Amino acid sequence: SISEVFKQVRTLGQPGDLLIIFSNGTSPSNLVQAIQTAHDRSMFVIGFTGAGDTDLSALLSGEDIEIRVDHHDPHRISEIQLLSLFCLCELIDQQLFGGTP
């Protein structure tokens, strides 16, 4: 179940892997556990967070990346996170396959 997503990280995650999390500002406990588990497995974390995610932010290490939407409306946070994800995918595509946007 989604409340136990950290179990998948513990089972499948390998050192050097990347965990990407999305939170709309509510710092759900399953994501807290997933980040802790990822760090226990020597994984990196990219956290797409909202203004209320101070618990998640505190867990991120110096090697992790936080892309924070400084807003309190969960719908607006999700919308901006989705746009950010599309931009990130476009940049990765350009790095892998070249070309111009």
Where are these regions (language model features)?
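Glycine-rich phosphate-binding loops that contact phosphosugars or nucleotide phosphates
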Residues: 1-98
